[in-house]
A protein has these predicted regions:
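Short glycine/proline- and charge-enriched loop/turn segments
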Residues: 4, 144-154, 194-197
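Acceptor-substrate binding/catalytic loop of class I
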Residues: 150-167
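A short beta-strand submotif of the Rossmann-like class I SAM-dependent methyltransferase core
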Residues: 96-102
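Conserved beta-strand signature within the Rossmann-like core of class I S-adenosyl-L-methionine
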Residues: 124-130
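A short glycine-rich, Lys/Arg-flanked "PGG" loop and its adjoining helix->strand segment in the class I
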Residues: 111-122
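Conserved N-terminal segment of class I S-adenosyl-L-methionine
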Residues: 1-92, 96, 110-113, 130, ...
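A structural helix-start
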Residues: 106-107, 130, 134
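Short N-terminal helix/helix-N-cap motif within the alpha/beta-hydrolase-1
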Residues: 107-111, 138
Length: 217
């Protein structure tokens, strides 16, 4: 079962990240925040404890992580594969929804994101992160005839969909969002960042490992 595949990722630290890269773009406090794919709840707990959210709700497919999230101070947390999202949330709406490294794992991220938009209050924001399949990490091996799935990263073996910047933007707009901003998460190594600086960003799309998109309803 797919749930078991995610439970197996736990020893890799897959669920433990506090997404400071995304939090840095949350420019004002929100009342209620929902995170889909909340893992162990680190990001939600940080938002609440630092005054960026009053009430935080998490959803994840891995039951073991939901237990951790509740212990970390997440107000409400549910186990779900998103099929029963409407039943769980009972028509509730939120000021912000986080979907960080989630949509690429879904068979139909387009329809899911449209459903998610219905849980946002007017003026609410969605924060979405997606890996960049146009990264040099993928393109160089591909030119040599290699496409190897891995435990983590852009070619994570649980990824079902792949996006470039253009198709990521189309995904949000197609779901009814007004795109506020797109942020490039560059390779962490010094050399790619230096190349990007020296070339004035000409090769930025190839040196980006992930896009963070902010959309408003």
């Amino acid at each position: 079962m797919i749930e078991d595949m995610y439970e197996e990722k736990n020893p890799l630290g897959y669920f433990d990240n506090i997404r400071m890269d995304v939090i840095s773009f949350i420019d004002k406090p929100a009342g209620e925040v929902l995170e889909i794919g909340c893992g162990a709840g680190g990001t939600l707990s940080y938002l609440k404890s630092n005054g960026l959210a009053q009430h935080v709700v998490g959803i994840d497919i891995a039951s073991s992580q939901i237990e951790v999230a509740l212990r970390q101070g997440v107000d409400e947390a549910f186990v779900s594969n998103l099929d029963d999202l409407e039943e769980i949330l009972h028509g509730r709406t939120f000021d912000a929804i986080l979907m960080l490294d989630v949509l690429e794992h879904l068979v139909d991220p387009w329809s899911v994101l449209k459903r998610i938009s219905g849980f946002l209050r007017p003026g609410g924001r969605a924060y979405v992160s997606l890996p960049n399949v146009q990264s040099v990490r993928v393109l160089v091996p591909l030119l040599m005839g290699q496409w190897r799935y891995k435990e983590l990263g852009i070619l994570d073996k649980t990824h079902l969909r792949f996006f470039t910047k253009r198709t990521a933007v189309e995904l949000l707009r197609g779901a009814g969002f007004e795109l506020e901003s797109v942020h490039h998460k560059l390779e962490s190594h010094t050399l790619p960042r230096l190349i990007n600086f020296l070339t004035l960003g000409v090769f930025k799309r190839y040196l980006t490992v992930q896009y963070i998109l902010v959309g408003r309803i």
